[in-house]
From Swiss-Prot:
Region Interdomain linker: start-end pairs: 427-437
Organism: Dictyostelium discoideum
Lineage: Eukaryota, Amoebozoa, Evosea, Eumycetozoa, Dictyostelia
Name by which UniProt lists this protein: ATP-dependent 6-phosphofructokinase
Pathway terms, separated by semicolons: Carbohydrate degradation; glycolysis; D-glyceraldehyde 3-phosphate and glycerone phosphate from D-glucose: step 3/4
Binding site for substrate: S199, I200, D201, R236, M243, G244, R245, E299, R326, H332, V333, Q334, R335
Length: 834
């Protein structure tokens, strides 16, 4: 490499061509540092009052949808903390070739809804050599970066840890080579590493879900849902091949979510003679009335001898057995596309947590690399290499054919879903004797996507446990009228992919006029347990039934349980409710389209979403869409708030912003309605921007259930029967009353009295809501603080956030080419790899 002068960017300028705004002290020789010059003078001087940290983010390995939201959240949270943030372009190649560019607030604007990674990714052969890693260390030190966030798979994270462990020795070599001064080792003693797993395979230990896995599953379900219609028409058998390498999560999740007949995954190879077992299972389905068959093959599927099982082999075997079989290999369609709500959410939360880790940790803590993961809806930190080594051990276990251990290493959720699939696909029934107990399911409240998959799992798992299954039509009103039918195995065939509610739902609840009719119906059908799957009205209904136990002794012999099935996520005993994920995906789809229309004409949109008195949908859609403001009842709306927000939008549009987005919950305020807010902003901003209002309405309740709503409703039903079995074993009869739901990554039971105390009847929501702090988080990372007159979100060294970090005009920026120019347009965010 030729000797050239380059710039260490210390925040005083971002021009790579040596213009006058660059601090000349930051010029160094690429091959040699002047020993008399202190490279770190600015940093050492500032340590006495406020050390300015410098951090970088890179994406490596295969891309996944959700990487961009993670980059956005990390970069902006770092800026709010007072640090300087850089992007390493093209993965580890960028470290080796010094393709490290500074980011400002506008650099990551508008990327939250984009798939892939705007900073590029690559697999680097040079980085695998020690010489390549030495160049990477030099380039990091040259830019005074000693905190690195790596977003990628286990290989990328292993590479980051290797760089960390070699850091000191590589610095010593650079000093010996004369490229760095000795005092550099004193000021850069360690390289701090944080990792976020970006992988569609969901193959990493230490997190419930990896960034990109939910979007990939969505792509698979969209394809399979489309294929099923043609398969049913022609009575065909389809073999679907999905990605996954050594991990069968995508095949397993899509198998559970679509009601597939058979899956082949590397973690649990089928027994010898599996071909005939598969054919027999497909034949049983056809004899039961199914018009199509579905086999899902993970690309890494093997048999017990370690021999690969290909989709072509499966298809040929089925054809030999007389099936009209077809293959669909989904390929890279699984990897791309707009991120789902969940991928945007977890990526945003993990990006913020990574920034907090670099700032909140002690020196000793920073010496140990961490993996930022998710447990339920919250972030967790785990030892990076412990998670990587555990993950990589799975490949060895598969190679050694220790298959009994593989599923256990994958984790409890993987094992649970595999057992659920085996039961629901009729591959292995318990064949237990009938318990002679009737279990009834009904819906109450508004319709929610996920109700039909729930009923399917409820029915099949219940039959598998030996219960007699019943379905009640039209909620508690239907129960009073005796509208009950027994549910059989094939009654719910195909329900896993259906939106709406086949059993029907309404908002009626038990009362003095119908309670005796309800009890008569329960006695006539010999019901021992009631599961209400629905919304807040349903919880009021089961609370009312529980109250009637004092007057009607018959109810004391019946278990009454509520399960969350509402888009509003406003019921007690759970962090999330089934249906809210589908609703948020519908909302984000609409918001993305609205934002595209707004860009063309400098427009501010005021969008109203459902949720009644609960602001969950508004808060979450704001966090994951990049909306500047969200208005919810829990925080209230005042005239002062609206005035400050109006000032903020005026300032933003004055600075050539082309779009603004406000999301309002439908009952956020009785006085300041959606139309009032629209009228106010339209009148005051008419010379700068146009304003439109949009009420999304019932599109939020419809649509095919999302992957998460399908598989989590199934998981919820599996735990419901575990609770029933434990209750039966402990007391000899069913007597549990309360609700079940998702709390802290698990499924928990809440007793009835505790559930009732948690409910706010006035506002029809839980008294305590876990997500409230995220409203402020969303606002903080969406609006440049110097644009926001109400901003109080500066921390620590916030004085370092200046006008230089503000989005600037397009004419001031040059566009990049790979490994060359070190700046890019921070306003329009071009795909760097194009």
């Amino acid at each position: 490499m030729t000797t050239t002068s380059k710039i260490i960017n210390d925040g005083e300028g971002e021009d790579v061509k040596g213009n006058k705004n660059i601090n000349k002290k930051s010029l160094i020789d690429e091959n040699r540092l002047d020993e008399k010059k202190d490279l770190l003078s600015d940093k050492v001087e500032s340590k006495t009052h406020c050390s300015v940290k410098r951090m970088a983010v890179l994406t490596s390995g295969g891309d996944s949808s959700g990487m961009n939201p993670a980059i956005r959240a990390f970069a902006r949270q770092v800026m709010l903390k007072g640090a300087k943030v850089f992007a390493v372009r093209e993965g580890y190649n960028g470290l080796v070739n010094d393709s490290i560019v500074p980011l400002n607030w506008g650099s990551v604007a508008g990327i939250i809804s984009r798939g892939g990674t705007i900073i590029g990714t690559a697999r680097s052969a040079e980085f695998r050599t020690r010489e390549g890693r030495k160049r990477a260390v030099f380039n990091l030190v040259k830019n005074r970066i000693d905190n690195l966030l790596v977003i990628g798979g286990d290989g990328s994270l292993t590479g980051a840890n290797l760089l960390r462990t070699e850091w000191c020795s590589l610095l010593e070599e650079l000093v010996k080579d004369g490229k760095l001064t000795l005092d550099v080792m004193e000021h850069f003693p360690i390289l701090s590493i944080a990792g976020i797993v970006g992988s569609i395979d969901n193959d990493m230990c230490g997190t419930d879900l990896t960034v990109g896995a939910d979007t990939a599953t969505k792509r698979i379900l969209e394809a399979i849902d489309s294929i099923l219609s043609t398969a049913v028409s022609h009575q065909r058998s389809f073999v679907i091949e999905v990605m996954g390498r050594n991990c069968g999560w995508l095949a397993l999740a899509s198998g559970v979510a679509t009601g597939a007949d058979y899956i082949l995954i590397p973690e649990s190879p089928p027994d010898d003679g599996w071909e005939q077992t598969m054919a027999d299972n497909l034949e049983r389905g056809r004899l039961s009335g199914r018009r199509c068959s579905l086999v899902i093959v993970s690309e890494g599927a093997i048999d017990r001898q370690g021999k690969p099982i290909t989709s072509a082999y499966v298809r040929q075997f089925l054809e030999d057995k007389g099936h009209d079989a077809r293959i669909t290999i989904l390929g890279h369609v699984q990897r791309g596309g707009t991120p789902t709500f969940l991928d945007r959410y977890i990526a945003t939360r993990m990006g913020i947590e990574a920034a907090n880790y670099f700032y909140d940790s002690t020196i000793e803590q920073l010496k140990q690399p961490v993996l930022i993961g998710m447990s339920g809806m919250d972030t967790i930190r785990s030892p990076l290499m412990e998670c990587v080594q555990k993950t990589q051990s799975i490949a060895s276990l598969i190679k050694e054919r220790r298959f009994n251990e593989v599923v256990d290493v994958r984790g409890g959720m993987f094992k649970e879903f595999y057992e659920i699939f085996i039961a629901c696909s009729n591959l292995h029934r318990r064949k237990v004797e009938s318990k002679g107990m009737g279990v009834l399911i009904l819906h109450s409240g508004g319709p929610s996507p996920g109700m039909n998959p729930c009923v399917r799992a409820f029915t099949r798992l219940g039959i598998d446990h030996g219960y007699t299954m019943y379905g009640c039509f039209n909620g508690f009103g239907g129960l009073a009228l005796g509208e009950i039918e027994q549910l059989h195995w094939m009654t719910v065939n195909g329900w896993s992919v259906m939106g709406g509610a086949e059993l029907g739902t309404n908002r009626s609840i038990p009362n003095d006029s119908n309670i005796e009719a309800i009890i008569a119906t329960l006695e006539r059908f010999k019901i021992n347990a009631i599961l209400m799957f629905g919304g807040f009205n349903g919880y009021l209904g089961i609370a009312k039934l529980y109250e009637y136990r004092e007057k009607y002794q018959q109810l004391k012999r019946i278990s009454i349980i509520g399960a969350p099935g509402t888009i509003a996520n406003n019921v007690p005993g759970t962090n999330i409710s089934i249906g809210s994920d589908t609703s948020l995906n519908n909302t984000l789809d609409a918001l993305d389209k609205i934002k595209q229309s707004a860009v063309a004409s400098r427009r501010l949109f005021v969008v109203e979403v459902m949720g009644a008195h609960c602001g969950y949908l508004a808060a979450m859609s704001s966090l994951t869409s990049g909306a500047e403001r969200s208005y919810i009842m829990e925080r209230g709306i005042t005239l002062n708030t609206l005035t400050k927000d109006l000032e903020m939008f005026v300032e933003r549009f004055k600075r050539e912003h082309r779009i603004g987005l406000i999301i309002k919950s439908e009952l956020a305020s009785n006085t300041y309605s959606t139309h009032f807010i629209y009228s106010l902003f339209k009148e005051e901003g008419k010379h700068l921007f146009d304003v439109r209002e949009s009420i999304l309405g019932h599109l939020q309740q419809g649509g095919t259930p999302s992957a998460i709503d399908r598989i989590f409703s199934t998981r919820l039903m599996n735990h419901y029967y575990q609770f029933l079995e434990n209750d039966l074993k402990e007391h000899g009869h069913l007597q549990m009353n309360g609700c079940i739901g998702f709390i802290d990554g698990g499924i928990h039971y809440t007793p009835m009295q505790e559930m009732i105390e948690e409910m706010s009847d006035k506002f029809r929501r839980p008294r305590s809501q876990w997500w409230m702090d995220l409203v402020e988080t969303s606002q903080n990372i969406s609006v440049f603080p110097l644009d926001d007159p109400s901003s109080t979100n500066f921390e620590g060294c916030n004085s370092n956030l200046s006008e230089q970090d503000r989005p600037i005009k397009k004419s001031d920026i040059s566009s990049p080419t790979s490994y060359s120019q070190k700046t890019f347009d921070p306003n329009v965010n071009p795909q760097f790899t194009l």
